[in-house]
């Protein structure tokens, strides 16, 4: 339940508007509300980090509005809370009126939801399930450079789950569509909320089964097999892609060293 922020309120401050995050001096604000001119603002506590409250304030600031990607190097738990705040702020902003009857909606007092004041329809934040998979072939990993990441970073394959599709089917389809190969021995590893814009990454490992690499040029700039001890530029630590790569490298080292 939201409330008005008072002078002595303190904690982490997620000030967000239109999927942007307020980052004075390039950092997520932490401390007393008065230090950041937040007294009197309406805020919602969205969690705790190391015993301190994490507050969401839906507000546009004139300066220092940036992407949540800028705080990706934070501790994983705090980064996830920042991402939660950005996603919730966008959810509340985009659900002011009911999609069924057009009447005004209001936030639930018991959960993250918006309720229609007329037809009683209930809306929840959208979450888009995605798969991400590290594929191994003997002592090598399949890594690709995506068209949307023209910075030299090579990563594992990923994609959105389609309607009526299992996670396993999504892995097989995405891998075939993007690289032209088939995989086998699929194994679930972990998951990670990913606020770009509202994904839930489900991470897998798989083994190469058959086929030659034929990339989808709309998705990939290039893809290739890289030996575990001779890898290109990788995604940053803290990402689920980096974990999948490091876990696969560890398995290769155990077998080949």
From Swiss-Prot:
Residue positions annotated to bind substrate are 25, 69, 111, 124, 192-199, 241
Reactions it catalyzes: a 5'-end NAD(+)-phospho-ribonucleoside in mRNA + H2O = a 5'-end phospho-adenosine-phospho-ribonucleoside in mRNA + beta-nicotinamide D-ribonucleotide + 2 H(+); NAD(+) + H2O = beta-nicotinamide D-ribonucleotide + AMP + 2 H(+); NADH + H2O = reduced beta-nicotinamide D-ribonucleotide + AMP + 2 H(+)
Per the database record, which ranges form the Nudix hydrolase domain? 125-248
Superkingdom per UniProt: Bacteria
What Enzyme Commission number(s) apply to this enzyme?
3.6.1.-, 3.6.1.22
Q: Does the keyword NAD apply?
A: yes
Q: PROSITE patterns under this entry?
A: NUDIX, NUDIX_BOX
Sorted alphabetically, which PANTHER family does this protein's record hold? NAD-CAPPED RNA HYDROLASE NUDT12, NUDIX HYDROLASE, NUDC SUBFAMILY
Please give the NCBIfam families that the UniProt record associates with this protein.
Answer: PRK00241.1
Q: What is this protein called?
A: NAD-capped RNA hydrolase NudC
Per the UniProt record, the source organism is Shigella flexneri
């Amino acid at each position: 339940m939201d409330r008005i922020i008072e002078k002595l309120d303190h904690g982490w401050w997620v000030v967000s508007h239109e999927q942007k995050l307020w980052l004075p001096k390039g950092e997520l604000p932490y401390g007393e509300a008065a230090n950041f001119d937040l007294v009197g603002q309406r805020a919602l506590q969205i969690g705790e980090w190391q015993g301190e409250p994490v507050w969401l304030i839906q507000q546009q600031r004139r300066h220092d509005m940036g992407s949540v990607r800028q705080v990706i190097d934070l501790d994983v738990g705090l980064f996830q809370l920042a991402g939660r705040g950005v996603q919730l702020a966008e959810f509340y902003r985009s659900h002011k009126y009911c999609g069924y009857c057009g009447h005004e909606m209001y936030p639930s007092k018991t959960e993250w939801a918006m309720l229609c004041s007329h037809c009683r329809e209930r809306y929840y934040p959208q979450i888009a399930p995605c798969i991400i998979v590290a594929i191994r072939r003997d002592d090598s990993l399949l890594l690709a450079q995506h068209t949307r990441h023209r910075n030299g970073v090579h990563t594992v394959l990923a994609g959105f789950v389609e309607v009526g599709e299992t996670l396993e089917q999504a892995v097989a389809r995405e891998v075939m569509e993007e690289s032209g190969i088939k995989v086998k021995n699929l194994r679930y590893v972990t998951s990670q909320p990913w606020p770009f814009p509202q994904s839930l990454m489900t991470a897998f490992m798989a083994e190469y089964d058959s086929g030659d690499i034929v990339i989808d040029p709309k998705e990939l700039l290039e893809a290739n097999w890289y030996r575990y001890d001779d890898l290109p530029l990788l995604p940053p630590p803290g990402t689920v892609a980096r974990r999948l790569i490091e876990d696969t490298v560890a398995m290769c080292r155990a077998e080949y060293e």
